[in-house]
């Protein structure tokens, strides 16, 4: 249809130009000739273009159609991790070309990125996968495990730590063994302190009586009564005994804490009692009191000093404290008073009191008023207890036996309630 239209248009223009030219010939021959040439050239060009397009369409319709490219086939291979990747076809739409690298392959749409699979060599099992060891790199030297010193440092550190632990353990054991006796003594003292104080007087009394029995053994070997007879006579006026005797019975105890020992244990006499017994034996060698007194006045003086110190320590123990420096006890004249002096002890009447056989044992307590001047009730208690012990030693009903007549007869005394008590 286009060709027909073009031909018709060309004919129409040609006819128009011919008519125009004829008209111009009449008016002006030159101008019309030029205009007609231009129209002819334009029509010729258009007709040539139309004829060229028609020839191309005929050629295209006559040529056979081109074939589509076949999809590529990617071969199976071992990747960089040693895993086997199976083969696959690239037939999904436009992704028909096998692209990528030898270790990683995929499908793509660009032909220019196609992979040349014939150049890859990872189609067989690698050697390092068979031996289980990675291949040695060319730039690394051969590794010699015998020259590796890293394990030696670990061994040295562990050895030093083990030695330090052993030294600490043995040091601790040595210190515990060195301090064990002190701990035993401290625990024993604490256990004695924490015991009930109600049994202290009875235990002290029984221990003191056991020691007195030993003294009587050295003084008189003839008569002796059981120690149980003395329990009923001295239970009411029992006071804490001398801490010197406690220290002789227990060398590791503390005098101010009132240590307690087993009342049934027989305590051996201490150094002072042995000295007293030896001096007593020297003083009573001939059996006569007068003769022995004339022969050994020094022995009697030592005995009197011993009993004086003993009673003084008993009074201080009853108050609960001991002097930090030695106190000299001076002798004073003896007092004459009725034999039965009433004295109250803790609100109770004491029993019959007599003068003990040792006059120097009951001296005035005015020298100790610096410790506790208002402690009059304790002083009365000490005097009452001393008189009681003197009665037990000299009376005929003494449970420990009759004392030998080595001392003058007891002298009466009495105690007043005055704070400034003077003995005449």
UniProtKB/Swiss-Prot annotation:
Database matches in Pfam families: Shisa_N
Glycan attachment sites: 45, 89, 116
Topological category with respect to the lipid bilayer: Single-pass type I membrane protein
Region of interest: Disordered: 333-424
InterPro entries the record matches: Shisa (IPR026910), Shisa_N (IPR053891)
Signal peptide annotation: 1-23
Location(s) in or outside the cell: Cell projection, Dendritic spine membrane; Synapse
Membrane topology (Extracellular): 24-149
CC per GO annotation: AMPA glutamate receptor complex; dendritic spine membrane; glutamatergic synapse; ionotropic glutamate receptor complex; postsynaptic density; postsynaptic density membrane; postsynaptic membrane; synapse
Record field: transmembrane: 150-170
Compositional bias ranges of the Polar residues kind: 414-424
Keywords per UniProt: Cell membrane, Cell projection, Glycoprotein, Membrane, Postsynaptic cell membrane, Signal, Synapse, Transmembrane, Transmembrane helix
Coiled coil, from the record: none
GO biological process: regulation of short-term neuronal synaptic plasticity
Molecular-function GO terms, alphabetical: PDZ domain binding
Residue ranges, Cytoplasmic side: 171-424
Subunit field text: Component of some AMPA receptors (ionotropic glutamate receptors) complex, at least composed of some AMPA receptor (GRIA1, GRIA2 and/or GRIA3), CACNG2 and SHISA9, as well as low level of DLG4.
PANTHER family the UniProt entry points to: PROTEIN SHISA-9, PROTEIN SHISA-9-RELATED
Protein family according to the UniProt entry: Belongs to the shisa family. SHISA9 subfamily.
Known role: Regulator of short-term neuronal synaptic plasticity in the dentate gyrus. Associates with AMPA receptors (ionotropic glutamate receptors) in synaptic spines and promotes AMPA receptor desensitization at excitatory synapses.
Protein name according to UniProt: Protein shisa-9
Gene: SHISA9
């Amino acid at each position: 249809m286009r060709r027909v239209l073009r031909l018709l248009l060309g004919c129409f223009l040609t006819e128009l130009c011919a008519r125009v030219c004829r008209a111009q010939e009449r008016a002006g021959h030159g101008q019309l000739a030029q205009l007609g040439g231009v129209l002819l050239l334009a029509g010729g060009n258009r007709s040539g273009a139309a004829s060229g397009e028609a020839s191309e369409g005929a050629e295209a319709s006559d040529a056979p159609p081109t074939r589509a490219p076949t999809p590529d086939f990617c071969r199976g291979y071992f990747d960089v991790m040693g895993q086997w990747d199976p083969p696959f076809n690239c037939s999904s739409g436009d992704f028909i070309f096998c692209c990528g690298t030898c270790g990683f392959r995929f499908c793509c749409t660009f032909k220019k990125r196609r992979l040349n699979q014939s150049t890859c060599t990872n189609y067989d099992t690698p050697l390092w996968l068979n031996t289980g060891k990675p291949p040695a790199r060319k730039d690394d030297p051969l590794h010699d495990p015998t020259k590796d010193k890293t394990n030696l440092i670990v061994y040295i550190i562990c050895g030093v730590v083990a030695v330090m632990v052993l030294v600490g353990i043995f040091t601790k054991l040595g210190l515990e063994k060195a301090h064990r006796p002190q701990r035993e003594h401290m625990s024993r003292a604490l256990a004695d302190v924490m015991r009930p104080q109600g049994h202290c007087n009875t235990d002290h009394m029984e221990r003191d009586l056991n020691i007195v029995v030993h003294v009587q053994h050295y003084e008189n070997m003839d008569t002796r009564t059981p120690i149980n007879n003395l329990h009923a006579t001295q239970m009411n006026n029992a006071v804490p005994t001398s801490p010197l005797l406690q220290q002789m019975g227990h060398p590791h105890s503390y005098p101010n804490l009132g240590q307690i020992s087993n009342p049934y244990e027989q305590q051996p006499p201490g150094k002072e009692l042995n000295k007293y017994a030896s001096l007593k034996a020297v003083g009573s060698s001939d059996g006569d009191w007068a003769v022995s007194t004339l022969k050994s006045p020094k022995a009697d003086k030592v005995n009197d000093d011993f009993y004086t110190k003993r009673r003084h320590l008993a009074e201080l123990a009853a108050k609960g404290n001991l002097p930090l420096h030695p106190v000299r006890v001076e002798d004073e004249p003896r007092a004459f008073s009725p034999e039965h002096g009433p004295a109250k002890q803790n609100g109770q009447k004491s029993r019959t009191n007599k003068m003990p056989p040792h006059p120097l044992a009951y001296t005035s307590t005015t020298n100790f008023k610096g410790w506790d001047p208002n402690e009059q009730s304790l002083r009365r208690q000490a005097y009452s207890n001393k008189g009681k012990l003197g009665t037990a030693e000299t009376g005929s009903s003494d449970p420990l036996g009759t004392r030998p007549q080595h001392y003058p007869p007891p002298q009466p005394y009495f105690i007043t309630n005055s704070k400034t008590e003077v003995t005449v």
